[in-house]
A protein has these predicted regions:
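Extended, small-residue-rich solenoid/repeat segments and analogous flexible loops
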Residues: 1-60
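Intrinsic-disorder/low-complexity regions
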Residues: 7, 17-18, 38, 61, ...
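Polar/charged alpha-helical tracts
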Residues: 11-12, 17-18, 30-33, 238, ...
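Intrinsic disorder/low-structure terminal segments
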Residues: 12, 34, 42-43, 57, ...
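Intrinsic-disorder/low-complexity coil detector
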Residues: 24, 126, 293-294
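Flexible, glycine/small-residue-enriched loop-and-beta-strand segment within the central core
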Residues: 34-35, 39-164, 175, 180
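Glycine-rich hexapeptide-repeat left-handed beta-helix
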Residues: 118-267
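C-terminal non-catalytic accessory extensions
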Residues: 250-307
Length: 307
């Protein structure tokens, strides 16, 4: 059995065997890293500060990658098992602890400049096996999760396996993403998450302490820096997923992440637009408009979705 190695402070890093720590966090307040496997890599970019953070490697050949820290210290509980990648981009802010569990060799990739509220969970798997009763084949395979750049995820949201979120999107409080494709510059809410507004963008300033003058000055913002579009620099989440799976060692995967994502500053790299999202919303509305006396709860639901 692989010996458990625990790092409660930076001084413990030199004692780690059969695993690799690259870089040093500037702080490790109430945090620790635990290794119960081998050939794992954890990377800390400059200015990464940890608070109430735990990273636990329960298996082999994983990569955990923390890019440069944001306004706040990183607060995260990350559990990885075998052959998975957890990547957090530059200048991401965690208001409180986010939780991520990675299983069955699948991954969680988070872009730059993301904002996370309270009580957020990321999972790329179902905990137990589910089978089709006729074919007797498994139907709940684990799937990677991708979050683009400048994504705001609200309180108690649950980002489930197979979810792909485009840059500039908003995931509302208590939303369950349901493994869906969430378009860039759209706002999503509900269970499962549905588009409630298209063609939006969001800014970081918090309105808590705003007075009348600040509210007035915030009413128009003409810079289009957070509006994303399709161009030749767009990356495919599916291609990234397949390439990470193709690479056999944690060293190869680390090099791929560094070159393809960490060193890539193209604005539109994680732009996502899935026409089916819009078509699904419109089809639900038109279908019910053609029905006689649709149930009240469905009518109200459709009204809420398009407001």
């Amino acid at each position: 059995m692989q010996q458990c190695q625990i790092c409660n402070c930076i001084e413990d890093f030199d004692l780690v065997e059969d695993n690799k720590i690259i870089g040093l966090p500037s702080e490790m307040q109430g945090s620790f890293i635990e290794f119960k496997g081998k050939n794992n890599i954890i990377f800390f970019d400059e200015s990464v500060a940890l608070e109430d953070t735990t990273v636990r490697f329960f298996g082999d050949n994983n990569v955990v990658f923390f890019s440069s820290g944001g306004r706040y210290k990183i607060r995260a509980k990350v559990d990885v098992f075998n052959n998975s990648v957890f990547y957090m981009g530059k200048n991401c802010d965690t208001t409180r602890v986010i939780r991520a569990v990675l299983s069955e060799g699948k991954h969680i990739i988070i872009g730059n400049d993301c904002l996370f509220s309270f009580g957020i969970w990321f999972r790329n798997y179902d905990p137990h096996l589910i089978y089709d009763g006729s074919s007797m084949e498994r139907i709940n395979m684990s799937k990677s999760v991708f979050v683009g750049d400048h994504v705001w995820i609200g309180q108690d949201a649950f980002v489930s396996k197979g979810t792909k979120i485009g840059s500039g999107a908003i995931v509302g409080a208590k939303c369950v993403t349901g493994g869906r494709i969430l378009n860039s510059n759209c706002s999503y809410a509900g269970v499962p998450g549905k588009a409630v507004r298209e063609n939006i963008f969001w800014l970081r300033p918090c309105v808590h302490s705003y007075k009348q003058a600040q509210t007035k000055s915030s009413m128009c913002y003409k810079n289009k820096e957070f509006i994303y579009s399709n161009d030749e620099n767009c990356l495919s989440f599916d291609t990234i997923d397949k390439e990470i799976d193709r690479l056999l060692s944690s060293e190869e995967r680390f090099d791929y992440l560094k070159k393809t994502i960490f060193e890539n500053d193209n604005k539109n790299r994680f732009y996502v637009h899935n026409e089916q999202t819009k078509l699904n919303l419109l089809s639900r509305i038109f279908r019910r408009n053609n029905e006689a006396s649709p149930p009240l709860i469905e009518t109200l639901s459709d009204f809420w979705l398009i407001c």
